[in-house]
Swiss-Prot record:
<comment type="similarity">
    <text>Belongs to the LsrG family.</text>
</comment>
<dbReference type="InterPro" id="IPR011008">
    <property type="entry name" value="Dimeric_a/b-barrel"/>
</dbReference>
<dbReference type="Pfam" id="PF03992">
    <property type="entry name" value="ABM"/>
</dbReference>
<feature type="domain" description="ABM">
    <location>
        <begin position="50"/>
        <end position="138"/>
    </location>
</feature>
<protein>
    <recommendedName>
        <fullName>Uncharacterized protein sll1783</fullName>
    </recommendedName>
</protein>
<dbReference type="InterPro" id="IPR007138">
    <property type="entry name" value="ABM_dom"/>
</dbReference>
<dbReference type="GO" id="GO:0003824">
    <property type="term" value="F:catalytic activity"/>
</dbReference>
<dbReference type="InterPro" id="IPR050744">
    <property type="entry name" value="AI-2_Isomerase_LsrG"/>
</dbReference>
Amino acid sequence: MRADFFLSDNRAALLKRGLTIILSFLVFTSIFLLPSPSLAEDVKGADDPIVVAGNIKVKPDKKEEFIALSQTFIEPSRSEPGCISYSFYEDETEDNSFLFFEVWRNRAALDYHFQTPYFHEFVEKSPDLLAKPAEIKIYKIAETQTL
């Protein structure tokens, strides 16, 4: 009878520990991985456009996998409140090279994008597909003029 008592205590402790881990994960995810409501409000702030230009060289045998991964986050990114433009191109002049060209309303909009789950998924999965580190530059538009 004593062994059964310890088993039930161990099960209860394991269950409690498991629930603690799950709840901790959910709290962490909601705080750090999901865009915060206050950040979403900042996106509506003043226009101060930010341009992101990325050049990505992919391993030849990973090209199709990279395209599929990229396509999973293009539409959600375009739907974000601060996204002005989001383009993904295959470079016609260099094999296995891709270009991203993004325009965001302001830095808060880009920061919001960086916190989305699909962006985190891309950052997590893409390194194994790349032939070399991605070349990504962020530009702040100082002035625009009509031609």
